[in-house]
Amino acid sequence: MAAPMLRHLCRVPQSGVWTRGPRAVRPGARGMLVAPRARGLFKEFFPESGTKTELPELFDRRRAGSPQTVYCGFDPTGDSLHVGHLLTLLGLFHFQRAGHNVIALVGGSTALLGDPSGRTKEREALSAECVRANARALQRGLETLAANHARLFADGRPWGTFTVLDNAAWFQKQHLMDFLATVGGHFRMGTLLSRLSVQSRLKSPEGMSLAEFFYQVLQAYDFYYLFRHYGCRVQLGGSDQLGNIMSGYEFIHKLTGEDVFGITVPLITSTTGAKLGKSAGNAVWLNREKTSPFELYQFFIRQQDDSVERYLKLFTFLPLPEIDHIMQLHVKEPEKRIAQKRLAAEVTKLVHGQEGLDSAKRCTQALYHSSIEALEVMSDQELKELFKEASFSELVLDPGTSVIDTCRKANAIPDGPRGYRMITEGGVSINHRQVTNPESVLVIGQHILKNGLSLLKIGKRNFYIIKWLQL
């Protein structure tokens, strides 16, 4: 007996794949797709022609009459989204802003297999418990980003809905033999083997496991399930997902005779050409506990001049004329990094909210501009995020506590004459102010900030954070 989720499978249509040639599309129908493509956000459309309804016509509300549904998948192979996920999320948000409904699909089941796309070797296997925990974390992250988007980037237009789902909701109800009997028969081995992601792995020394090979079948079924239950006709994914998207298209078309579509976004790579993802070990996370707002902000501040215009178009909702104006100002005074600062501000606000952006700016002022004012209003959390390697101490401020007393209690200098000389020779600063008299008594408001903290620096790189008690 077929599993519950498979009972609605349709018969394979006799007509086969559509073979119509491309035809003219009504003026204005391409608008929804033209704007993101002009920004460089949409890279490839599949299929581009030969379908009953052309992809641009789906998004022509005058013709379609109702909003479309678009989805993108996020496998919980880690416990946080990272900057490599941002482009597909921005793609979903652009559809939502145009009034269409979007689904962020967490792969609580597919992550157990591991997507081989774009990988040179098999992923490290994760336990079911780990995947479930990661899936919950990704769902929270997606909901936070969607909430920030709605709260801080509203433009007055009626938006579509943003829904987060987990494919474990339907795959956990499946039975292996039923699934293979009812779904497996609609996939041809030759077609699956022809995918570039499969070919590259089969030619590699490590080869490819059956679990990885089967991944594209499960992703195709995701697309089918969302098509049947949510009316979803468009899948969004990274450019390395095109093969999986094609499998979904072929599966749905065989079963229903209907056309669905895929849109890819470009992959963002590091300066060495490696994909910016956690697998490469260079991830910038979208979770504050893993990458602070300050670190995210600085990641975009550090982008090169030859990349910043492209990133403004990809990672922000700023109108293209405004981006042109920003770049004109930037070219006149590149040393001010006007474009990078605007890019960093827009992304940090989307990921961490206005509070996170304010925190990133405070940390920037405190670290790079030696701002006492910024230090005074920083929270314990911000100080720990900014000075991750710093030792954190809680000390009682006794009457007459001196500079050398403080340094020794914090274990910041060696005992004896050597530690004394480190102070007299200018190697110690408190709150960005050099101190050279070891016997100087600490002064509240100078050595101890309004927030009850002191930032002690020994040499050029060693920081110590002191929280004073009983002030």
From Swiss-Prot:
In chain numbering, motif 'HIGH' region lies across 76-85
Q: What sort of enzyme, by top EC class, is this? A: ligase
| UniProt cross-references to Gene3D superfamilies, sorted A to Z | HUPs, RNA-binding S4 domain, Tyrosyl-Transfer RNA Synthetase
Q: Give binding positions for L-tyrosine.
A: Y71, D115, Y215, Q219, D222, Q241
Where is this protein chiefly located?
mitochondrion
A family per Pfam: tRNA-synt_1b
Q: What positions does the record give for the motif labelled 'KMSKS' region?
A: 275-279
Q: N6-acetyllysine is carried by which residues?
A: K349, K361
Q: Which residues bind ATP?
A: D75, I268, K278
Q: Where in or outside the cell?
A: Mitochondrion matrix
What PROSITE patterns does its record include? AA_TRNA_LIGASE_I
The UniProt record lists the EC number as 6.1.1.1
Q: Which reaction does it catalyse?
A: tRNA(Tyr) + L-tyrosine + ATP = L-tyrosyl-tRNA(Tyr) + AMP + diphosphate + H(+)
Under InterPro entries, the record lists:
aa-tRNA-synth_I_CS (IPR001412), aa-tRNA-synth_Ic (IPR002305), Rossmann-like_a/b/a_fold (IPR014729), S4_RNA-bd_sf (IPR036986), Tyr-tRNA-ligase (IPR002307), Tyr-tRNA-ligase_bac-type (IPR024088)
Q: Which family does it belong to?
A: Belongs to the class-I aminoacyl-tRNA synthetase family.
Role played: Catalyzes the attachment of tyrosine to tRNA(Tyr) in a two-step reaction: tyrosine is first activated by ATP to form Tyr-AMP and then transferred to the acceptor end of tRNA(Tyr).
Protein name, as recorded: Tyrosine--tRNA ligase, mitochondrial
Q: Which species?
A: Rattus norvegicus
